[in-house]
Amino acid sequence: MISFQIILQQRLRSLRFGKRCKSKRTLKSNSTAVGSSDEDDEIYVPKKPIPSPIDQSKVEEPPVFTKALITHLERLSLVRFSDEQAVLNLKQAVRFANQLKLIDTTGIKPLETLLEDIPCPLREDVPGDPMTKAEVLMNATKVVEDYFVTPPGNIPLEESDKLDLMKIEDDAQKEMSKKTLLKDSVKKTE
């Protein structure tokens, strides 16, 4: 989940940065180069923060996380939300993902992989050396009467009453107010 959030943040940053810097000349004048001595491999870092083009007031708020919803998510993902911070992180990730709904993608072609145009030859499906039943069953971790035994399905987790839902909502409100204050202070300095 955290890696998904990082990928989304990087994608939004690249959208913001790419939209403002149309050419390499503009890119060089608005940023400083860092890293490689090769001009084509330079990494450009903006000289000042670039405000988000997404209007945060239009972003859909994440749902209220009730005990029933948290239990349902834990059962589906087989991940226990150990404390309030874990639920708050999930709430922030959902809010961040909701920003993607506001991005206008009209006229943008979908991403295609390079492998779509490369032929993938397959070998003929001719059986080689036949394996014995005992050799096949050696791959199983558990066998009963010469049959593979599959692992049990998702075992439901017990409900946990440790989470303080009011604290989660308060922390989310504090986080949003911090971001609003920070955004207002950045606007005042400009």
Swiss-Prot record:
It catalyses: L-glutamyl-tRNA(Gln) + L-glutamine + ATP + H2O = L-glutaminyl-tRNA(Gln) + L-glutamate + ADP + phosphate + H(+). GO terms for molecular function: ATP binding; glutaminyl-tRNA synthase (glutamine-hydrolyzing) activity. Keywords: ATP-binding, Ligase, Mitochondrion, Nucleotide-binding, Protein biosynthesis, Transit peptide. It is an enzyme of class 6 (ligase). One of its GO terms (biological process) is regulation of translational fidelity. Residues 1-96 form a transit peptide. It is found in: Mitochondrion. InterPro entries: Asp/Glu-ADT_sf_sub_c, GatC. SUPFAM superfamilies: Glu-tRNAGln amidotransferase C subunit (SSF141000). Pfam families: GatC (PF02686). GO terms for cellular component: glutamyl-tRNA(Gln) amidotransferase complex; mitochondrion. Residues 28-57 are annotated as: Disordered. Its EC number is 6.3.5.-. Disulfide bonds: none annotated. Belongs to the GatC family. Allows the formation of correctly charged Gln-tRNA(Gln) through the transamidation of misacylated Glu-tRNA(Gln) in the mitochondria. The reaction takes place in the presence of glutamine and ATP through an activated gamma-phospho-Glu-tRNA(Gln). Subunit of the heterotrimeric GatCAB amidotransferase (AdT) complex, composed of A, B and C subunits. This is Glutamyl-tRNA(Gln) amidotransferase subunit C, mitochondrial. It comes from Loa loa (Eye worm).
